[in-house]
Curated annotation (Swiss-Prot):
Phosphothreonine modification, residue list: 72
Pathway: Protein modification; protein ubiquitination
EC number: 2.3.2.27
Protein name: E3 ubiquitin-protein ligase TRIM47
Catalyzed reactions per annotation: S-ubiquitinyl-[E2 ubiquitin-conjugating enzyme]-L-cysteine + [acceptor protein]-L-lysine = [E2 ubiquitin-conjugating enzyme]-L-cysteine + N(6)-ubiquitinyl-[acceptor protein]-L-lysine
Zn finger spans (B box-type): 177-217
Record SMART domains: BBOX, RING
Coiled-coil residues: 296-324
B30.2/SPRY domain sequence ranges: 410-631
Length: 638
């Protein structure tokens, strides 16, 4: 039956049944609209699926629109049916189904269904048909981006038969059809803008993106799928770098926690010792007070008893004399003699009160200790929190250095031949910063650099070297231990560190790596290794090694260079200021290079440092090592 007639439903291609007129003027069967929008409801527009739209013109309906039967059109259809068999398209009973019928479309697959649903992966719930009755929905075969609904093979029939629906875009079943619509125009996303890298509908393509390079989504997907392997490879590399960075950060966190626990234990132990010393001093002072009190009380109480006894004897002798009868001369003489003897026995001066209590000076001694302790606590706290008085920063006291020496195993590993795995715990990923590269340096990604004869037109940058063929690594270092490796491919090269705030516009004689107090390096001059700092050079007797390890130790203010061979690390030179001997005598008074280190090297660590590289000869070429436990790959000369 031709579905283009004025009295036919564009969905089922049958004569209109219970006709409903939409605001745009198009007519549909009420049951067909209910089957097309089961998730919106047959009697209203809007809902969780988004704004309803006309299946023909795609005009959206206003929220809350109630679909009602068009009585005039219904009566016109009845009159048309009664005018004769030649005028009506079919018998009358087929035109008036019950309004309560859930759907006018068949609910079972027909033999002529356009396609069958593909099997879904095990354990995954398939997308259900939106036109099937609720509770008995079949798996969907396709989703319509125009109708915003999914259909099983049976309910896809109208999209195959109706000319008005054949232009709808059918895609494999989608769970969230709303994500395939333009949020602004509520139209299907069918185009891709390569300029702004967004998916567009036709309205967006004709308005905001006019003049941009627009391609179909399928074409862009095919192109992006070809690049997918490169993107995934880059993602894997970045994840590896992040994994190394995460491991390094975790080691730093663990180091901070362990150092804090150890320092907390040392402080608690020292405070306990100080408290024990104060407790012992308190016991001594209190004992001194008790001893002084007992001694002085013994003397005073003995004198008190003697005076009381003498007074008692005098009182008794006087009383006895007063009781002698006047006629008894013998008793009178005897009692008077006894009174005189008692008087003479105590007539000497007794000991007076003590002029000074010796134990009362105890409070003065304790007060002095308290005041000195308070002042010492304030001074030490200010020294602990305030900046150091010299450029070397906080240093260990000699007594603490003697009492708490550095771990011997770590010292031996850092200053002698050691397994490479030990240093990989401190691995740091170095990426070359193109904004610092001199115009005669060509970068290969972020890991390789080669000196060239023709200048490269780099963009202007305030951090770019202008007089020296140098380049820095990204990221500044200011604490902890860091290790990276450099592969010397060809030519004269230098590798080391440079202060972040060093001016890249310095002239050639002062701006080169190791020729100033703001940088130091290891140089390979084609014949031998040497180290440079503050304009002084110290030759090294070691043979050539194509792979050099660099270890920056902020805690010890040291920079070490190693030759890497077969998983072993051989120390080339460790740059560090020597500890002065007792009495202020320097450790190496006859070595000018070490003397320069002793006087200026620690000041380098007051700055944030960056990995630095200097390519001196015209054929110089180096590469940042991959820092993997497996053998380092041999790079071909470019």
């Amino acid at each position: 039956m031709d579905g283009s007639g004025p009295f036919s439903c564009p969905i089922c291609l049958e004569p209109l049944r219970e006709p409903v007129t939409l605001p745009c003027g198009h007519n549909f069967c009420l049951a067909c609209l209910g089957a097309l929008w089961p998730h919106r409801g047959a009697s209203g527009a809007g809902g969780p699926g988004g704004a309803a739209r006309c299946p023909l013109c795609q005009e959206p309906f206003p929220d809350g629109l109630q679909l009602r039967k068009n009585h005039t059109l219904s009566e016109l259809l009845q009159l048309r049916q009664g005018s004769g068999p030649g005028s009506g398209p079919g018998p009358a009973p087929a035109l008036a189904p019950e309004p309560s019928a859930p759907s006018a479309l068949p609910s079972v697959p027909e033999p002529s269904a356009p396609c069958a649903p593909e099997p879904w992966p095990a354990g995954e719930e398939p997308v259900r048909c939106d036109a099937c009755p609720e509770g008995a929905a079949l798996p969907a075969a396709l989703s319509c981006l125009s109708c915003l609904a999914s259909f099983c093979p049976a309910h896809l029939g109208p999209h195959e038969r109706s000319p008005a629906l054949r232009g709808h875009r059918l895609v494999p079943p989608l769970r969230r059809l709303e994500e395939s619509l333009c949020p602004r125009h509520l139209r299907p996303l069918e185009r891709y803008c390569r300029a702004e890298r967004v998916c567009l509908c036709e309205a967006c393509a004709a308005q905001e993106h006019r003049g941009h390079e627009l391609v179909p989504l399928e074409q862009e997907r095919a192109l992006q799928e070809a690049e997918q392997s490169k993107v995934l490879s880059a993602v894997e590399d970045r994840m590896d770098e992040l994994g190394a960075g995460i491991a390094q950060s975790r080691r730093t966190v663990a180091l901070i926690k362990s150092a804090a626990v150890a320092e907390r234990e040392r402080v608690s132990r020292l405070f306990a010792d100080a408290a024990a010393a104060l407790q012992g001093f308190q016991t001594q002072v209190l004992g001194f007070i008790e001893e002084g009190e007992a001694a002085m009380l013994g003397r005073s109480q003995g004198d008190l008893r003697r005076q009381e006894e003498q007074r008692s004897r005098l009182s008794r002798a006087r009383q006895n004399l007063s009781q002698v009868p006047e006629a008894d001369s013998v008793s009178f003489l005897q009692e008077l003699l006894a009174l005189r003897l008692a008087l003479e026995d105590g007539c000497g001066p007794g000991p007076g009160p003590p002029r000074e209590l010796s134990f009362t000076k105890s409070s003065q001694a304790v007060r002095a200790v308290r005041d000195m302790l308070a002042v010492a606590c304030v001074n030490q706290w200010e020294q602990l929190r305030g900046p150091g008085g010299n450029e070397d920063g906080p240093q260990k006291l000699d007594s603490e250095a003697d009492a708490e020496p550095q771990d011997l195993e770590s010292t031996n590993l850092l200053e002698s031949e050691a397994p490479r795995d030990y240093f990989l715990k401190f691995a740091y990923i170095v990426d070359l910063d193109s904004d610092t590269a001199d115009k005669f340096l060509q970068l290969f990604g972020t890991k390789g650099v080669k000196r060239v004869l023709c200048p490269i037109n780099y963009p202007l940058s305030p951090t770019r070297f202008t007089h020296c063929e140098q380049v820095l690594g990204e990221g500044a270092l200011d604490r902890g231990t860091y290790y990276w490796e450099v592969e010397i491919i060809e030519g004269w090269v230098s590798m080391g560190v440079m202060a972040e705030d060093f001016s890249p516009q310095e002239p050639y004689d002062r701006g080169r790596l190791g020729r100033n107090a703001h940088s130091c390096c290891l140089q390979w001059n084609g014949r031998s290794f040497s180290v440079w700092f503050h304009g002084l050079e110290a030759p090294l007797p070691h043979p050539f090694s194509p792979t050099v390890g660099v270890c920056l130790e902020y805690a010890d203010r040291a920079l070490a260079f190693y030759a890497v061979r077969d998983g072993k690390m051989s120390l080339l030179r460790r740059l560090k200021a020597s500890r002065p001997r007792r009495g202020g005598i320097p450790a190496s008074p006859i070595d000018p290079f070490q003397s320069r280190l002793d006087s200026h090297f620690a000041g380098l660590f007051t700055h944030r440092l960056k990995p630095a590289f200097f390519l001196e000869s015209v054929d110089a070429h180096l590469q940042i090592g991959p820092l993997k436990k497996s053998c380092i790959s041999v790079l071909k000369r470019r």
